[in-house]
């Protein structure tokens, strides 16, 4: 019984250490997702190696995704303004989306678990899911590691 209490205390201490703005470098998307969920709602600051499989926009932001389906629970979304995307790609916003697909990036920023509401006629339905997002505010947060996503 005492051993169980010690193990539980150690686990809780480890979880507490993951919260906040601890700097970490992680290559596995599942590690990043787990760390962001454990630190929610604050998130985890770090440098993350991510392979981009898909991209999209809603007009207000450009989204780079590590999975083909952005709703996949294994996906991490990098969100940035169209201006930042165009500056990084050296082209217009429409071309910038496709510039990143198939590339491996080093992204510096805060990985946060975000609640995404399902909408009906523009209003939340009460149903939701979570995504992990890294918001990029300036081009210096992204470094191209490879032209091929490994």
Can you name each region flagged by the protein language model?
Residues 18-150:
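OB-fold single-stranded nucleic acid-binding module
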Residues 4-12:
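Sec-dependent N-terminal signal peptides
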């Amino acid at each position: 019984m005492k051993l169980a209490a010690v193990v539980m205390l150690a686990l809780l201490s480890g979880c507490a250490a993951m919260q906040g703005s601890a700097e970490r470098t992680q290559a596995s998307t599942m590690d990043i997702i787990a760390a962001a969920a454990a630190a929610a709602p604050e998130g985890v600051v770090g440098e993350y190696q991510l392979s981009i499989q898909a991209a999209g926009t809603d007009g207000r932001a450009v989204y780079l995704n590590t999975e083909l389906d952005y709703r996949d629970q294994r996906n991490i979304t990098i969100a940035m303004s169209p201006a930042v995307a165009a500056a990084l790609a050296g082209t217009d916003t429409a071309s910038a989306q496709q510039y990143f697909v198939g590339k491996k990036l080093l992204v510096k920023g805060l990985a946060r678990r975000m609640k995404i509401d399902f909408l009906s006629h523009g209003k939340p339905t009460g149903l939701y899911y979570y995504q992990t997002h890294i918001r990029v505010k300036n081009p210096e947060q992204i470094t191209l590691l490879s032209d091929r996503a490994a």
